[in-house]
């Protein structure tokens, strides 16, 4: 990877994916936990919930470690990540599920005949994809120019502003679930999104990169991007260990939110590396003081 040129566009892709993942955990997870505690003044009990999502997140986090070691998202790892995502879809679709309570637009669409309902959903996906394709490039160029005007590092700008725009709908939905006394669905939504990001999104980067290059290639990372992937893996590992008991009080939410906010003020790669060690150190500390957390991560059933 060191011999390959890392273009601005490649750096932006790495910035976006790492920022999105840390935003979901640091802001999304913490908001659900804290809002529930403020509303009910009790801990969020998720025992027996999210077994599949947590298991897949553990696998994806471990693969993030391999990406850092090899300093690239190799085509092999990309295929593995996409395979993990497809396995997640298959297992979740064949498992037990509850019929959702539809309201508003969802209720209207759900009431349509099967053929019309499927056609409507497909058209909505196509419309959303078209909007993203038309808006993404001007949006990124606007961010870069704004950053240059105010002297803001474009890597940091792309890492946080772009994910804030793309991930805010999921976070808002999770918050609405929580306000409607369904925090389990809210947090499951965000953990599932985290799995999607670390598997399908990261794997797709290499696939798209290979298509644009006209040959099968790995997606290289420079030192800064490798550190960002390491920090993302560290945040994910710590969060997994932290929520392992599945009984989450305000302290858990405050820790996730506090660490997330503090690390935003340190953008230097060396400082980010230190934060990676801090997150890993905290994860190890939690395991040492409560070894049962590892056992609690082993699902009895998916």
Q: What spans do the regions from the language model cover?
A:
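Hydrophobic alpha-helical segments, chiefly the membrane-spanning helices
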Residues: 1-302
């Amino acid at each position: 990877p060191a011999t390959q040129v890392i273009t601005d566009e490649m750096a932006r892709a790495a910035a976006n994916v790492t920022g999105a993942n840390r935003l979901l955990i640091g802001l999304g997870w913490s908001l659900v936990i804290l809002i529930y505690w403020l509303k009910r003044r009790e801990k969020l009990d998720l025992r027996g919930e999210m077994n599949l999502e947590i298991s897949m997140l553990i696998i994806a986090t471990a693969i993030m470690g391999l990406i850092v070691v090899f300093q690239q998202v190799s085509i092999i790892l990309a295929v593995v990540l996409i395979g993990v995502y497809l396995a997640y879809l298959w297992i979740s679709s064949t498992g037990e599920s509850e019929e959702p309570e539809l309201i508003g637009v969802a209720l209207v669409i759900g009431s349509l005949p099967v053929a019309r309902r499927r056609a409507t959903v497909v058209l909505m996906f196509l419309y959303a994809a078209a909007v993203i394709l038309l808006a993404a490039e001007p949006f990124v160029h606007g961010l870069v120019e704004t950053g240059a005007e105010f002297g803001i590092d474009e890597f940091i700008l792309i890492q946080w502003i772009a994910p804030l725009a793309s991930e805010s709908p999921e976070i808002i939905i999770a918050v609405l679930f929580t306000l409607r006394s369904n925090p389990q669905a809210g947090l499951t939504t965000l953990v599932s999104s985290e799995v999607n990001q670390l598997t399908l999104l990261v794997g797709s980067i290499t696939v798209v990169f290979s298509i644009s290059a006209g040959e099968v290639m790995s997606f290289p990372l420079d030192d800064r991007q490798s550190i960002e992937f390491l920090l993302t893996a560290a945040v994910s590992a710590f969060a997994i260990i932290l929520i392992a008991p599945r009984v989450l009080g305000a302290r858990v939410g405050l820790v996730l939110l506090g660490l997330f906010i503090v690390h935003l003020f340190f953008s230097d790669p060396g400082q980010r590396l230190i934060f990676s060690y801090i997150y890993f150190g905290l994860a190890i500390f939690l395991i040492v003081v409560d070894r049962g957390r590892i056992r609690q991560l082993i699902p009895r059933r998916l």
